[in-house]
């Protein structure tokens, strides 16, 4: 039985969503991140790769890097670029490229499920990278990067998601330079939130996976 809960996301205002959207922190090197950051002051890489805003050559694990990540995140919130939802929600996230669509739902998985085996691990990870992300999350007091989990969706959950998409307008709908269109819907009705939670409670296991042909959570 999987625990998957709604939460209050800290997310970009609609008119800045395309600017805030950024590549994962570990697919760009220091120079690439710096170039993106210099060209776009709203890029979330200022939080994920904050060394771009410090002196060249600083050690990636220097305490000042983590402090800068928190400062940059707080500054984006202070300026109203990022705003937190007032109630806990689920978020439908859709990616479209060259006619192919991949749809998932964003929520909070349980660390206890990771420990008790409900979340299935796919590979060994490097301890230095783990400690870096733990320190980053602790410093920002925020989960700054998504974890992808794959599962076999119950038909009722798929139906619920499709009905929500067709009856509600996406809060974000933009296409990036890589020709990938991003769309997000916010599920904010208590009865529907309860139904989503119950559907996940009937799922035996989730698979931790950075990439998968399956639908992603």
What are these regions (language model features)?
Residues 1-206, 213-217:
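A cross-family signal for N-terminal binding/gating loops and helix N-caps
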């Amino acid at each position: 039985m999987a625990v998957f809960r709604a939460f209050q996301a800290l997310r970009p205002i609609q008119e800045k969503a395309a600017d805030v959207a950024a590549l994962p922190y570990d697919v760009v090197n220091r120079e690439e991140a710096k170039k993106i950051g210099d060209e776009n002051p709203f890029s979330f890489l200022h939080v994920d790769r904050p060394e771009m805003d410090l002196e060249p050559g600083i050690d990636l694990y220097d305490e000042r890097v983590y402090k800068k990540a928190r400062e940059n995140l707080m500054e984006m919130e202070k300026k109203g670029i990022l705003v937190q939802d007032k109630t806990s929600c689920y978020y439908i996230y859709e990616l479209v490229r060259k006619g192919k669509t991949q749809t998932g739902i964003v929520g909070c998985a349980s660390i206890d499920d990771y420990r008790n085996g409900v979340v299935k691990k796919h590979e060994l990870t490097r301890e230095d990278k783990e400690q870096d992300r733990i320190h980053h999350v602790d410093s920002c007091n925020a989960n700054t990067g998504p974890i992808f989990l794959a599962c076999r969706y119950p038909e009722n959950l798929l139906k619920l998601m499709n009905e929500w998409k067709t009856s509600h307008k996406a809060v974000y709908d933009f296409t990036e330079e890589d020709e990938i269109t991003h769309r997000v819907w916010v599920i904010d009705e208590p009865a529907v939130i309860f139904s989503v939670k119950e559907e996940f409670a009937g799922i035996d296991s989730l698979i931790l996976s950075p990439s998968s042909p399956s639908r992603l959570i």
